[in-house]
């Protein structure tokens, strides 16, 4: 028995997977039986000290002979800061706050820029498998690859006969990754979190062949903030997605997120948050505020960050930290860049959940009257004229039967304004942004989806980020799209090669004849038209910059 156990352990050690990096270093990963994983590989120098808030610097140390068998730490996280806990019963609250996406992610460190590669068992260099590069979500405030396990997707790809390699890149969030303000603009350090992602893509281009991946077959995909990040990489450098003369990616998948409705790095709100952050960190009177911030402790910066509003605060989707036009890599407002055709021309999938706004509507339950709703919208959308606010409120009336969660009649109106505000927030940030993108993007084949899988769920409906449950943890009709169809798209640039029971139609415009959406519900898949809430679309998208934050 002891001999058999010893031989088993020897065989296990001998079976540990290896990969050779572009610089000649050989690293060892973890044999997880159903897959092989290389976890926590550094791709950038620690962004600490003088590198804090700055562009990432490629990692220059030797990794030869090292083992990468566990995830690296999460980047520093902001407290999402909810105000609704005492106002709402436990049913919906538990659903939101106990989900992995909204739980605190530990351990945390500023030294966090690592990348994870998971491949089918037995994959060797030369296999040239398609690569799916995941960008996690979390409102640009929280998140980590550790809460989005790729095992289900990689295993399904093997069962489908379309094996892929899954890569997940860590990136700085909150103040560490998306601090704005005049000082940041002057230094050219804006959007550091996006630059982390971009450097991770370059690492993949240089090294993935040594793991058995094909650097010419990379699909970038993400959810929520990750989805918006994918859009940012489509328009990065006015659409130039090349590195060393070759494209960094050949396709994109966006799950709940497109253009970020944001003012420039040196805009009014970015400076307001910067001033609050600097003051909270004790650097308000410093002659060189950034130098002061770079000398502060991590705990000091964490406290200062948590003193700014999170996405579950009253200000909700008026986020403190998010990608902003910087005049360098994101050269203009994102809607204009898409409208002007300044994007990488690649095939895309983009889709939404039917009730994207309900989570964010929970933070304004003290808004109960029509007058208070108007004041809330005026405070949230400082660029909108009185006439534009009037048009918005007419398109999204107080009538609870028209609000979100949609198609629920008089039910789920936990306040007279909850369903109304939820509808506006969900449509602005997700639903109508997706439709705007699809109506203007002409860079490649387009597919779109809309899920109503949880339409019977009280208060929340088919809420934002529920797709992660089906993508990473459970099976069901959603999983067929978020796994099988996405894998087929990454492999063949056509989701229909997954053998879907319903043909997924191509999307040309929201007014095209015939169906243009793949619809998901609890019973299965069907197709539909992207022609709902047109008055809301017109109110929000006729002049999108009026609703920038």
Curated annotation (Swiss-Prot):
Pfam families the record matches: COesterase
InterPro entries from the UniProt entry: AB_hydrolase_fold, CarbesteraseB, Carboxylesterase_B_AS, Carboxylesterase_B_CS, Type-B_Carboxylest/Lipase
Active site positions, chain numbering: 224 (acyl-ester intermediate), 356 (charge relay system), 464 (charge relay system)
EC number: 3.1.1.3
MF GO annotations: triacylglycerol lipase activity
Database matches in CDD domains: Esterase_lipase (cd00312)
Record text on subunit structure and interactions: Monomer and homodimer.
Stated name of the protein: Lipase 3
Species whose genome carries this gene: Diutina rugosa (Yeast)
Gene field: LIP3
């Amino acid at each position: 028995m002891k001999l058999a156990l010893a031989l088993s352990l020897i065989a296990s050690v001998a079976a540990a997977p290896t990969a050779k990096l572009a610089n000649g270093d050989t690293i060892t990963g973890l044999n997880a039986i159903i897959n092989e994983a290389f976890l926590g590989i550094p791709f950038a120098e620690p962004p600490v000290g003088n590198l804090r808030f700055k562009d990432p610097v490629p990692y220059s140390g030797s990794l030869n002979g090292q083992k990468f068998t566990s995830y690296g730490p999460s980047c520093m996280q902001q407290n999402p800061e909810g105000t609704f806990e005492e106002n709402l019963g436990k049913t919906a609250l538990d659903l939101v706050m106990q989900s992995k996406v909204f739980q605190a992610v530990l351990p945390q460190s500023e030294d966090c820029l690592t990348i994870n590669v998971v491949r089918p068992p037995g994959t060797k260099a030369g296999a040239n498998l398609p690569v799916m590069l995941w960008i996690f979500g979390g409102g640009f405030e929280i998140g980590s690859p550790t809460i989005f396990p790729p095992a289900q997707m990689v295993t399904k790809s093997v069962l489908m006969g379309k094996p892929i390699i899954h890569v997940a890149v860590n990136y700085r969030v909150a103040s560490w990754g998306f601090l704005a303000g005049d000082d940041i603009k002057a230094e050219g350090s804006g959007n550091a979190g996006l630059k982390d992602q971009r450097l991770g893509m370059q690492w993949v281009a240089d090294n993935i062949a040594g793991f058995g991946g094909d650097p010419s077959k990379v699909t970038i995909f993400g959810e929520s903030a990750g989805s918006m990040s994918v859009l940012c990489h489509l328009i990065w450098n006015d659409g130039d997605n090349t590195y060393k003369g070759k494209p960094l990616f050949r396709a994109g998948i966006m799950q709940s997120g497109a253009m970020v409705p944001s003012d420039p790095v040196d805009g009014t709100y970015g400076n307001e948050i910067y001033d609050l952050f600097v003051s909270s960190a004790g650097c308000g009177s410093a002659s060189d505020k950034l130098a002061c911030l770079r000398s502060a402790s991590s705990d000091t910066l964490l406290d200062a960050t948590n003193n700014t509003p999170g996405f579950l605060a009253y200000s909700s989707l008026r986020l403190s930290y998010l990608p902003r036009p910087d005049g360098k890599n994101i050269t203009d407002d994102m809607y204009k860049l898409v409208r002007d055709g300044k994007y990488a021309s690649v095939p895309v999938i983009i889709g939404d959940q039917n009730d994207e706004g309900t989570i964010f509507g929970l933070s304004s339950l003290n808004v109960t009257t029509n007058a208070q709703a108007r004041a809330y919208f005026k405070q949230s959308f400082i660029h909108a004229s009185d006439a534009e606010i009037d048009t918005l409120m007419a398109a999204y009336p107080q009538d609870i039967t028209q609000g979100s969660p949609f198609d629920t009649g008089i039910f789920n109106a936990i306040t007279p304004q909850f369903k109304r505000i939820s509808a506006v927030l969900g449509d602005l940030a997700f639903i109508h942004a997706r439709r705007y993108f699809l109506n203007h993007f002409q860079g490649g084949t387009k597919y779109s989806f809309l899920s109503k899988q949880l339409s019977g769920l009280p208060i929340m409906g088919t809420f934002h980020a529920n797709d992660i449950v089906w993508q990473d943890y459970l099976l069901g009709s959603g999983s067929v799209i978020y796994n099988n169809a996405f894998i087929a798209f990454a492999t063949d640039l056509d989701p229909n090669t997954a053998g879907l029971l319903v043909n997924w139609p191509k999307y040309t415009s929201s007014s095209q004849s015939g169906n243009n959406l793949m619809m998901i519900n609890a019973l299965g898949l069907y197709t539909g038209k992207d022609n709902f809430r047109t008055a809301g679309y017109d109110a929000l998208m006729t002049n999108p910059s009026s609703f920038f934050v």
